[in-house]
């Protein structure tokens, strides 16, 4: 039976439960344990796939094609375990499963209720996702006191009652606000948060106290006294300059030792080696170079919509000890002739998106980068914009467009995918009338790269696998015409039916590459990703006046 660490939050949301949990997971992993993570989200959507990026932020995609919460991105950036749809569960999915079972008659005519049917389904999902691991960390979304979270809290209370303290731990992250007028930290919100948690039958084993500054020992003792938590288990989580330094901070305070002692794992663990995290922090704090990258998107007012893109760019810089400064630009603002916002930029990245708003701005951005020889990296919609730009302005296909934006276009160079193979080899089909949710080409897909191309050079191998999330694709009817006009198709699906990567010849542009996949989902601070490393290096070379630079690894 896998020992479980349940991570809850109190007082306010967005305190960083996911980062704290992932940091602890990375320490336990460094000590030799096989670790996994899971997110329980209280919203009634089945998954975040159809939620607005302005409300929810990024939709993170796993290898098996699950559309999940962005916290799974945090998890995979901190731990080596690759997650799946089992690791992201919502209230919507729980109710969907229970109702499906009720319709099949699985409950034998019983009245279906929150307790025991909903809570049992939650526990079943937890068991399924965590089986076979040494330790599992499970984050409960939302804040204690929210009505939506109650079924999840009741389910984990039941787990603790049945398994005992040696197999289930409660970790509660709470706010200790600093009141500037009084010049002191206030512990009362934490006391009330724990009181709320205890009222539903959960006594925390560990408190993570988020604050602007380190919580002094006197306040930790006070919190311990009023919350019935050991002083040793009251952990200070102050604001830090580099988030990737959180594993080092939690290790310093001995959080991992609390877990090992409670779960009696001493005979399974070794000393923690966090040298990779120390190297990451050092590279962030002591860069040797810096570049300015423009990110031209549709949801830039809510930057969590591009969380993995921003992190992957920074990772690409870390591998070269280069600070990456991001300039966020709204695509709609670039739909005219004024491209002054892109002056003095070392590289341009156009990320994914849906719908016609801002698409023309992305096309204009591609045209600017192509003509001005600025390194360009297009992802998903950014690739489609680059193809439309090339079709219109180089191949002379007037009014070329994507059918997503103009179904009457005389040259639909981007069209709806009607049939494709999933990661497991199964054929999926869709049409214009299909549901939006869960009907895209999703998950890890292999692609073959063309020898002698930029893509092949950057990746360093012939076959690569990337995660996808898209409904529209390069229209094969225009392959030959655009290749004859000079566009290089450097990556194709293994069955040769889908275009995966396009680029410009190196003799016409220093670095212009666009891919249909989402490589940002496979980038980590310790390893980076070849495309982002190559793009940042190209930006550095542009800044250096075209001089070829040797990579300085972190």
Curated annotation (Swiss-Prot):
Function field: Catalyzes the ATP-dependent amination of UTP to CTP with either L-glutamine or ammonia as the source of nitrogen. Regulates intracellular CTP levels through interactions with the four ribonucleotide triphosphates.
HAMAP family recorded: PyrG
GO molecular function, one term: metal ion binding
Residues reported to bind CTP: 13, 146-148, 186-191, 222
Subunit description: Homotetramer.
Pfam families: CTP_synth_N, GATase
Residues binding UTP, per UniProt: 13, 186-191, 222
Catalytic reaction annotation: UTP + L-glutamine + ATP + H2O = CTP + L-glutamate + ADP + phosphate + 2 H(+); L-glutamine + H2O = L-glutamate + NH4(+); UTP + NH4(+) + ATP = CTP + ADP + phosphate + 2 H(+)
Taxonomic source organism: Xanthomonas axonopodis pv. citri (strain 306)
Catalytic residues identified in the record: 380 (nucleophile), 518, 520
EC number(s) stated in the UniProt entry for this protein: 6.3.4.2
Record's miscellaneous remark: CTPSs have evolved a hybrid strategy for distinguishing between UTP and CTP. The overlapping regions of the product feedback inhibitory and substrate sites recognize a common feature in both compounds, the triphosphate moiety. To differentiate isosteric substrate and product pyrimidine rings, an additional pocket far from the expected kinase/ligase catalytic site, specifically recognizes the cytosine and ribose portions of the product inhibitor.
GO BP terms in the entry: 'de novo' CTP biosynthetic process; pyrimidine nucleobase biosynthetic process
PROSITE patterns: GATASE_TYPE_1
InterPro entries tied to this protein: Class_I_gatase-like, CTP_synthase, CTP_synthase_N, GATASE, GATase1_CTP_Synthase, P-loop_NTPase
Binding site for L-glutamine: 353, 381-384, 404, 471
Lineage of origin: Bacteria, Pseudomonadati, Pseudomonadota, Gammaproteobacteria, Lysobacterales
Name of the protein this chain belongs to: CTP synthase
